[in-house]
């Protein structure tokens, strides 16, 4: 088992050729928000990941093992609800209103210019449909917002 205890956000400082050569690991959001987990990379190696508590792993980040090997993180497709304005009489403002209501419920949400994504929840799906939004379930990568107090800079 390879022990991983370092993370390079978005592969910062690494040459593109190194990123291209690195093994990859696909992780869903449930795993990526944990600081300790096991996974298997694209080369079949078992990874024991031990990051500082509170660390969130994002697609595009690079995990660095104790032996110096690198593993590129990919956000694995998972079940998500994709929310879009009604094609007949909706507007982009409808997404703003939906994001407001979802935020009031502390729902993790991925914001895009033309859609929102959340993890499946039939109660929320019904609420959004009642707001005249289109809600469909699909398989896609999920990268929710970090929130107002998430680490990171401009």
Region roles according to the model:
Residues 87-137, 141:
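Conserved, well-structured core segments that form or line functional sites
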């Amino acid at each position: 088992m390879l022990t991983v205890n370092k993370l390079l956000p978005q592969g910062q400082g690494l040459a593109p050729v190194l990123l291209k050569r690195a093994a990859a690991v696909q992780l869903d959001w449930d795993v990526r928000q944990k600081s300790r987990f096991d996974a298997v990379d694209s080369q079949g190696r078992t990874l024991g990941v031990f990051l500082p508590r509170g660390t969130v792993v994002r697609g595009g980040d690079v995990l660095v093992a104790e032996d110096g090997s690198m593993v590129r993180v990919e956000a694995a497709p998972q079940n998500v609800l994709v929310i879009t304005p009604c094609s007949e009489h909706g507007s982009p403002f409808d997404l703003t209103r939906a994001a407001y209501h979802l935020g009031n419920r502390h729902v993790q949400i991925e914001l895009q210019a033309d859609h929102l994504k959340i993890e499946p929840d039939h109660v929320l799906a019904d609420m959004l449909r009642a707001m005249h939004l289109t809600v469909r379930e699909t398989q896609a990568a999920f990268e929710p917002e970090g929130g107002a107090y998430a680490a990171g800079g401009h």
